[in-house]
């Protein structure tokens, strides 16, 4: 959520920056609502002052033995007018807030201006895609060869865009998540967390999934109207519960940064993606991810973004997977991000790079919604923290990359050296 004072005092400057994202801010509508708010604010304050003054007059008149009934009626009338003005002001402020909740974050100045993914800018590349001297198999074919990926069983159990993993493929999937968690906790300084997979409405508002992206979520539907689970939703990413751990908190600046990680399943409806990536593990309704979240001082957030992205890169480097790093243009960034790096891993069967991690600086956009603040010992004044989030990594897509990049001519899959301790020393699947 943007700073309301910025929207009030510099609407044209805000509109210009939002236009870089392809978002049109209705400055005239906001201006009209703000003028009406000011009028109502003054009206309620004047009515409150007048009622207080007349209420005091009742006591004074009573002490003098005067008839207080006319004054009492007048105070009652002022009270009714005040209640009506307050109700109108509350409704207007709610309307302004509803509009503010749909406005995306401002892009950082260094973010390239563009319309969509075609305007993203490559920053660097790591590794060289392997040249195969045999016909490359995709991960679906490899998974079926080793009886490790069963999409038909998942359709029977649930529906499309789900999978049942079995045997050594399932074991490698688990090994990847354990390897990522160990790397982030033991070398990168993150604290491991286990979080709920169902969250409430306040949590979803805090990180920006609501109200704008309600259609992307899986919501619970209780059997009884009175059930207290009616407002729960499955998490689309561990960013949601991890970041909200600081909601409503005032943090000592000496305790920053706070660096958290969690391995969770993620649940997404994939609204708007009909017909895209229908084969395999690339786009699923349920997938695992190891998430990284940092809570930092405002002046440290850009450096933290570089650090966090480097942590995600380290996973790919240790796995020996070629990838490229890109900075997203203004038109392709997520709703809450001010700056985002994507890491795209090489997928041999598609002969292209595919997103495997997205790392974003959100500035104080989420913190303002959550009222997450920090305070130094030398200053009693609080300020909003900055929040960052990043994939470290998407486990299913990492499994795809390992299976395809490490495949052998006979269909076996070599186990990357860093994963072997998690697989009892196994060198090959198959």
Swiss-Prot record:
Statement: the UniProt record of this protein carries the keyword Aminoacyl-tRNA synthetase: yes
NCBIfam families associated with the record: serS (TIGR00414)
Keywords: Aminoacyl-tRNA synthetase, ATP-binding, Cytoplasm, Ligase, Nucleotide-binding, Protein biosynthesis
UniProt EC number: 6.1.1.11
Protein name: Serine--tRNA ligase
Annotated positions binding ATP: 268-270, 355-358
Domain text: Consists of two distinct domains, a catalytic core and a N-terminal extension that is involved in tRNA binding.
Gene Ontology CC terms, in alphabetical order: cytoplasm
Reactions this protein catalyses: tRNA(Ser) + L-serine + ATP = L-seryl-tRNA(Ser) + AMP + diphosphate + H(+); tRNA(Sec) + L-serine + ATP = L-seryl-tRNA(Sec) + AMP + diphosphate + H(+)
Subcellular location: Cytoplasm
The protein's role, per its UniProt record: Catalyzes the attachment of serine to tRNA(Ser). Is also able to aminoacylate tRNA(Sec) with serine, to form the misacylated tRNA L-seryl-tRNA(Sec), which will be further converted into selenocysteinyl-tRNA(Sec).
Transmembrane parts of this sequence: none
Pathway(s): Aminoacyl-tRNA biosynthesis; selenocysteinyl-tRNA(Sec) biosynthesis; L-seryl-tRNA(Sec) from L-serine and tRNA(Sec): step 1/1
UniProt cross-references to InterPro entries, sorted A to Z: aa-tRNA-synt_IIb (IPR002314), aa-tRNA-synth_II (IPR006195), aa-tRNA-synth_II/BPL/LPL (IPR045864), Ser-tRNA-ligase_type_1 (IPR002317), Ser-tRNA-synth_1_N (IPR015866), SerRS_1_N_sf (IPR042103), SerRS_core (IPR033729), tRNA-bd_arm (IPR010978)
GO molecular function annotations of the record: ATP binding; serine-tRNA ligase activity
Residue numbers binding L-serine: 237-239, 291, 391
Any one biological process term the GO annotation gives: selenocysteine biosynthetic process
Pfam families per UniProt: Seryl_tRNA_N (PF02403), tRNA-synt_2b (PF00587)
Similarity comment: family membership: Belongs to the class-II aminoacyl-tRNA synthetase family. Type-1 seryl-tRNA synthetase subfamily.
Subunit structure: Homodimer. The tRNA molecule binds across the dimer.
Annotated gene: serS
């Amino acid at each position: 959520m943007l700073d309301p004072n910025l929207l009030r005092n510099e609407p044209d400057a805000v509109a210009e920056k939002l236009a870089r994202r392809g978002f049109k801010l209705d400055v005239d509508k906001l201006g009209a609502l703000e003028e009406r708010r000011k009028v109502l604010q003054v009206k309620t304050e004047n009515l409150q002052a007048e009622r207080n003054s007349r209420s005091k007059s009742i006591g004074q008149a009573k002490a003098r033995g005067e008839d207080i009934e006319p004054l009492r009626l007048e105070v009652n009338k002022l009270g009714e007018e005040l209640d009506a003005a307050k109700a109108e002001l509350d409704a207007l402020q709610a309307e302004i807030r509803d509009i503010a909740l749909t406005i995306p974050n401002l892009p950082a100045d260094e973010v390239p201006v563009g319309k969509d993914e075609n305007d993203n800018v490559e920053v660097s590349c790591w590794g060289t895609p392997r040249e195969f001297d045999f016909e490359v198999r995709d991960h679906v074919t490899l998974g079926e060869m080793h009886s490790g990926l069963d999409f038909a069983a998942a359709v029977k159990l649930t529906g499309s865009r789900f999978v049942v993993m079995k045997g050594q493929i399932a074991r490698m999937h688990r090994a990847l998540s354990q390897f990522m968690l160990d790397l982030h906790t033991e070398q990168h300084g993150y604290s491991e967390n286990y979080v709920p997979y169902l969250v409430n409405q306040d949590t979803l508002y805090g990180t920006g999934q609501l109200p704008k992206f309600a259609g992307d979520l899986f919501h619970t539907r209780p059997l009884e109207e009175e059930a207290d689970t009616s407002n729960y939703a499955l998490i689309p990413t561990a960013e949601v519960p991890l970041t909200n751990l600081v909601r409503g908190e005032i943090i000592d600046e000496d305790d920053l940064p706070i660096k958290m990680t969690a391995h969770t399943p993620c649940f997404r409806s994939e609204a708007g993606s009909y017909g895209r990536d229908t084969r395999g593990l690339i786009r699923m309704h349920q997938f695992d991810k190891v998430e990284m979240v940092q809570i930092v001082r405002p002046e440290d957030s850009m450096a933290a973004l570089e650090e966090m992205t480097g942590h995600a890169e380290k996973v790919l480097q240790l796995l020996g997977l070629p990838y490229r790093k890109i900075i997203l243009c203004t038109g392709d960034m997520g709703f809450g991000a001010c700056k985002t790096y994507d890491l795209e891993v090489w997928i041999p069967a598609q002969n292209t790079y595919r997103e495997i991690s997205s790392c974003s600086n959100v500035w104080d956009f989420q913190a303002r919604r959550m009222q997450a603040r920090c305070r130094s010992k030398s200053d009693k004044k609080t300020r909003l923290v900055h929040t960052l989030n990043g994939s470290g990594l998407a486990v299913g897509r990492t499994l795809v990359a390992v299976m395809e990049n490490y495949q052998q001519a006979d269909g076996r899959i070599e186990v990357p050296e860093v994963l072997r301790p998690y697989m009892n020393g196994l060198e090959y699947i198959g």
